[in-house]
Amino acid sequence: MLKKILLSFLMIGFISANTPKVVLITGTAHGIGKSTAKYLLDKGHIVYGGDILVNENLYLNDIGGIALEMDVTNQEHVDNAISRIIAEQGRIDVLVNNAGIAVGSAIEDVSMEDAMYQFEVNLFGIGRTVKAVLPHMRAQGSGTIINISSVLGKAYNPLGGWYVASKHALEGWSDVLRLEVKQFGIDVVIIEPGLIKTNISNASAKYYQKYSKNSEYGN
């Protein structure tokens, strides 16, 4: 599945460009974000990777990338990351919104605090980052925004209602954004991975252990 995702970047087209692209990827400490960062660096692009897991993200500095401390729920973190990239590179060509969490439990069982945090990361964190990047892409007259959604942005299954809702919301939001920014030469792409064994899967299982394993929904 990871290979298919990376190949989809080839299909988007920016990788084959003669000029290296300046790319910001969120959630690069593990999983899809880490594999994507390595892949794009191998292709000669300039890659900044943001993650809340600062120490686990430092590998980027050793392979030619730039690691950033970036919690997408923190406006200051987002603003500082974008400001640094613009100061150092003068532009941002590609934004890959990959950071996300999965609350894997029954809708009734999950606290509203965790339900809202699900949306804070998976939707509003993306919105926060996109809003910070768009003025620069509009000034450039070009840019690509890639939102990592999920097959569950189109489908659904039990014990994941809040996650499914956040991805369905992201899909509709991305479709509207695409229509709004097309006039500025900016494209918006949605990638919908299937099940991949990454840290987000492990985290989802922990939420299940916390909430639904011993509830009426887990029996």
Give the positions of each predicted feature.
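The beta1-alpha1 cofactor-binding region of Rossmann-like NAD(H)/NADP(H)-dependent oxidoreductases
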Residues: 70-80, 112
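Conserved glycine-rich cofactor-binding loop
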Residues: 29-30
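Substrate-binding pocket helix/loop in short-chain dehydrogenase/reductase
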Residues: 106-107, 114-116
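A glycine-rich helix->loop->beta "capping" turn
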Residues: 84-95, 103
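Residue(s) in the substrate-gating loop at a strand-loop-helix junction
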Residues: 150
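SDR active-site lid
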Residues: 183-219
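Active-site helix of classical SDR
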Residues: 130, 166
